[in-house]
Amino acid sequence: MVKESDILVIGGGHAGIEASLIAAKMGARVHLITMLIDTIGLASCNPAIGGLGKGHLTKEVDVLGGAMGIITDNSGLQYRVLNASKGPAVRGTRAQIDMDTYRILARNLVLNTPNLSVSQEMTESLIVENGEIVGVTTNINNTYKAKKVIITTGTFLKGVVHIGEHQNQNGRFGENASNSLALNLRELGFKVERLKTGTCPRVAGNSIDFEGLEEHFGDTNPPYFSYKTKDFNPTQLSCFITYTNPITHQIIRDNFHRAPLFSGQIEGIGPRYCPSIEDKINRFSEKERHQLFLEPQTIHKSEYYINGLSTSLPLDVQEKVIHSIKGLENALITRYGYAIEYDFIQPTELTHTLETKKIKGLYLAGQINGTTGYEEAAAQGLMAGINAVLALKNQAPFILKRNEAYIGVLIDDLVTKGTNEPYRMFTSRAEYRLLLREDNTLFRLGEHAYRLGLMEEDFYKELKKDQQAIQENLKRLRECVLTPSKEVLKRLNELDENPINDKVDGVSLLARDSFNLEKMRSFFSFLAPLNERVLEQIKIECKYNIYIEKQHENIAKMDSMLKVSIPKDFVFKGIPGLSLEAVEKLEKFRPKSLFEASEISGITPANLDVLHLYIHLRKNS
């Protein structure tokens, strides 16, 4: 049977959900093909959304019309701001989720969205004509024709699950791997490599002895992800902290020879920042204990996820390891930990729209691009979906810059540098992180969302009013000069603020940590009518004024630099500071400008600085 749509999405994980929903929202006829409809939105690993860098991605996805934020706000069990005591640039919202509720909400949203249809089958091969995608075939002899195809297959491409010496061809425990499509992608000439990830054991909640374990609470004023969320007052559950110990470590060491990670059974490279417990014991042999979090998987507390205990050790060893840990001495394991190896395609095979360079109209998003994490997948799915629709409409692509969003950092890192290990987002990856805070996501991306038809006009108008109020009041504060007069000193004293000794402007005064929003309203009467969202932005802009200005200067400098032309006869070979790889690629593509050079995979900002210097030296000589 032959069926037609505008866009096909292959895979119903976090990338596939966002890709299909956003494309349908933008008016395309979308069909989602997934192996199991019941697992749409399943959190395969930890029961949490957000975190450092990841919370930023989730909020950016939300502002740009995505679903992850609002689903999380309606399925969370605990909400916290990580790094709350640090500056706003490195804070991250994180939520424990009820995995069942999240999955049900995601699935129902997909099944009830206009312009979006779903079928349960396995994609086996792509149909390509003259270098352009035209459709796919499935395992039940269906043929789907479409102008654009987005592949979001997660860990299912030639997936192999490892538990001890046992191996099974699964894309997730108990689910079939996608071997035919994996082979087809190799035959089409894509650069396919292997990665590995893993998951932790789960234990029955009623078998845990919580006595003596450290209780971990959510925030009193819980943060949320979606700007659409109102009257947020969720019921929150506690997590609990326990630790491994020398006995645990010895059990693991005694069984290194049975660990797939060390026996040569696993070849794929695992996530650097989420290592297995056996890897941690091996690499950090001097540590006497490792922290573990017991996290409820649902509101019923029937199962707990042991965060920090990712493992692929044999079943009997997992039993011994868990029973050596305080609180888990009599724990009943409901699901064992395992490792999974899978195919991914080097993301340098993609453009910044996530379209493949090799096949027109084919987009890749999520773990197939070498990333790890629900949030990274959702961000890519969203951007692939948006760009597929824009391409259908013959409109300009939507590409976020590194100075606009963490999504921009994520995609730029992937397509220019590639990856040889599962890529995870951190705030440290963003050179302009002071401008890319969670708190200003709406102001950074609201204009884009409205232009793309992904934000309601009434809300957008309110947002523009807020932006105008921020700029007008910052200008007023800069012009407001305070002297150490008797009246000023008295008012400062009433607010328990230290006196001023010289002239200062309003911005300098509000840069004080102690000058909270309440004091701002009290001291400067013109700030009193402003809403909290506006006041918060004014406070942050005042506190980090010098650094924010410096980052804006750096952006302007970079934008100016990228406009620099590269002479036709410019010789790249022999320039100190350029790697052999950079020279080879520059000689091959012969970019006409530094901007064109920046679009070449493998060309780094440091390479661009070197080129700029030597172009300048040549002109002057």
From Swiss-Prot:
Q: Which Pfam family is one of those matched by this entry?
A: GIDA_C_1st
Q: Name one GO molecular function term.
A: flavin adenine dinucleotide binding
Q: How does it assemble?
A: Homodimer. Heterotetramer of two MnmE and two MnmG subunits.
**Gene for this chain:** mnmG
Q: Name one GO biological process term.
A: tRNA methylation
Residue positions annotated to bind FAD are 11-16
Does this UniProt record's set of keywords contain Transcription regulation? no
What InterPro entries would the database entry show?
A: FAD/NAD-bd_sf, GIDA_C_N, MnmG, MnmG-rel, MnmG-rel_CS, MnmG_C, MnmG_C_subdom, MnmG_C_subdom_sf
Question: What's one GO-annotated cellular component?
Answer: cytosol
State what protein this is by name: tRNA uridine 5-carboxymethylaminomethyl modification enzyme MnmG
Cite the binding residues for NAD(+). 270-284
Listed cofactors: FAD
What is the purpose of this protein? Answer: NAD-binding protein involved in the addition of a carboxymethylaminomethyl (cmnm) group at the wobble position (U34) of certain tRNAs, forming tRNA-cmnm(5)s(2)U34.
Q: Which family does it belong to?
A: Belongs to the MnmG family.
Q: Which HAMAP family match?
A: MnmG_GidA
Question: Where does this protein reside within or beyond the cell?
Answer: Cytoplasm
Which PROSITE patterns does the record associate with it? GIDA_1 (PS01280), GIDA_2 (PS01281)
Species this chain originates from: Helicobacter pylori (strain P12)
Give the Gene3D superfamilies listed for this entry.
FAD/NAD(P)-binding domain, GidA associated domain, C-terminal subdomain, tRNA uridine 5-carboxymethylaminomethyl modification enzyme MnmG/GidA
